């Protein structure tokens, strides 16, 4: 592993093309913080998928739709195309309301994945299919595609991610999970940097935000949020005086990951900080990809540090790659069958024997891909959850 730092800070600070320069000077602010609201919902973990669909997914949609209607600056980010499919199937009236806010740019389709998958065990083909199937759904239902990888809770990150993400047209990635490390990753730090570029195995680069704070941060301190010292300190550590911060769902019964929404009072404080803040921090109610979009093309920003290497998690992650061995076996078997089925179908279509069965193959892919979720394939969910997982794995094998 190594970090390559390009010395261009002086040029960047005086360059008129830098987004931080123009926005900070125009606003009269010294720092800029992208506030990224999200509602982290584990599809399965200490509960099964039935509870997710019956309760947590419904609550998440209802609560955030209400906040979007009440607070004009609120922007909500939510990932996982499979969850949107379930909302459309089980709660079509909510899905139609979501469409409106997506069109307005205030409900952001983040993550660009069918499900927030573990990045280490799935094959590269599975990783790409996860993105492909999600983007096809988003384009069909919302007329847009997602732009980033949004994996706040996965258990370590392979260097192939920038390569695959860039190949799929994605421009950025964020996570808070590296803060869980017990040992430093680079020097005395758990992350290579707060904000910078990550280089993949083929040299492709995407922008990354690696110190966004916990995704369950929801109780903002009273007062002018634009004068908050914690936010200012976060921005001081990054190029151009910028920071990328998660905030989101409140805890349920002392535990997180149930979905939900940010606290209304915190959103009020953010709105006040945006419209009437007197402090040095310019607050942006942001989509998960806005930071990356603001800094493109990345070649114009040589001051951004570049990390080359893996970003593993050294705590519970190693055990995740050995637990629930049968689940991992079924997943790999489906990946092999999917590869064989795809090759056979393409040859048969090319030879004029039978048309390529896109719908049938996509259905089989989806049936097992969502179980590559970071608490499912990894073996960290409750026993009851795996009755659903194994069933889908077997059904997918039959379909392929």
Give the location of each predicted region.
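Bacterial N-terminal signal peptides
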Residues: 5-16
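N-terminal secretory signal peptides that target proteins for export/translocation
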Residues: 1-2
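Catalytic-domain carbohydrate-binding cleft regions of carbohydrate-active enzymes
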Residues: 25-400
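Boundary at the C-terminal end of the N-terminal hydrophobic targeting segment
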Residues: 19-24
